[in-house]
Amino acid sequence: MPPLEWHEKLKEAREARGNEGEVNDAPVPLIFDCRNTYETEVGIFEGAEPLATENFRDSWDVFHEKLKDKPKDTPIMTYCTGGIRCVKVGAYLTQEMGFTNVSRLAGGIIAYDRTLNDEAPEEEPMFKGTNYVFDGRVGRQITKDALGKCITCGQNTHLLSNCKNIECHRRMVQCETCNHSYAGRCSVVCKETEIFVDDHSQNS
């Protein structure tokens, strides 16, 4: 589904959720965010349901649980960062689970963000927060909504990073203040352990 068509479908679904759950006499589509937890906790499309997985391979069990009682013609919309994962998801839902009305966001959130900015800048994005990206930026802020919770203090933030302790390097949501206080590390343990390792190597 092209990004602008996706945008309109989400707007229709938002309206329908307040109108007895139907879009033009059709059921509201189920919208699934097929990314992992660390991605969805800082940004998500309005009305979407995250799979809450730690790894993509866990998605199949989640789909079986969420869709076990749904009719096979239930409208299902899926999306991910760049669209690749949803090609696999679409094939699984149709070929393995028998669903007949499955669509995906072509090009993923990246294409949606770019297309909306280029072709419909007056439209309010239906994606809220930050899109996790797999490059040096880590996150691309699409709206100012701070959906994430700092792992250190619990405050709302949109900032994503990787722990700078090379032995950890975990993906984390951490506010600017805590990131500075912990020198880019996720915890006191990571901060102190790395200092110990550095000191040890200098004395050897």
Where are the language model's segments positioned?
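Fe-S ferredoxin-like electron-transfer domains
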Residues: 1-12
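Rhodanese-like catalytic fold shared by cysteine-dependent sulfurtransferases
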Residues: 7, 16-19, 27, 35-75, ...
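Catalytic cores of enzyme domains
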Residues: 81
